[in-house]
């Protein structure tokens, strides 16, 4: 019953009852990602527990072979979710031994019945990452991304810490941009 309630809330949040919508989470069920095609525009949303972390936010690409930010549909029947687990070690990072437990979700988008791209999500207990996987279109051998329309919409009242981005090749030993620049609370 809770699963149906969450799905109904997600559909209402996107404002389109007939939009294709998929939802996936980590095994702890706290971090939930919802992907939909809101009137032909791909969007995603991230919730953590009862809190909206990212409101419905745009996905998409403008390329030399087409505008894939609108007029496309999420293909629910081809949606796939699988667990990811692994271990790696890097001696030069703060936590040198890392165990990975995550969920991989492949969200396929189509235009006029043709597979355009997948948005491949990697969701762990406290992280969300995604990438685009493009598919060949006709005889075009190369797809050039002219603009990415991906964005994120923070909920009303969100507070953040913003850090100015240093220009490249500046700072000590020309190592900028670095993450040690000053920041102020908003």
Give, region by region, the residue ranges found by the protein language model.
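Sec-dependent N-terminal signal peptides
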Residues: 4-13
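N-terminal accessory beta-strand-rich subdomains and adjacent acidic, glycine-rich linkers
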Residues: 23-186
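Sec/Tat signal peptide C-region and signal peptidase I cleavage site
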Residues: 14-19
